[in-house]
């Protein structure tokens, strides 16, 4: 969700975090996890049939799933909504290095991005910064 996903299907349940990482690495070799962040912030979403993708992944990685004793989950698709009043037509990236003081009306939050009327800021990129917020 912190990447701005609008829907998801849980695939597997594993015994621990380490196993989760190992399975994820194998699946990621075939299934890209790249999101065009500018399109995502404009809400220009490419529709994907997650049930078809799920079935392909489970079939292709059946050995990995079996070797790691992962339990295949039979769950529904989850949809996510974000508090956004207005999506930008053009995405202008803001950051505290170039602009130490950012002013403007906050019109939305999507994942790790704060959307202002005049630009967006990836707040995770600025973790550890001390900021002052006035409203």
Predicted regions and their residues:
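Conserved RNA-binding domains used in RNP assembly and mRNA/RNA metabolism
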Residues: 6-10, 14-15, 21-135
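Arginine/glycine-rich "motif VI" loop of SF2 helicases in the C-terminal RecA-like domain
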Residues: 1-5
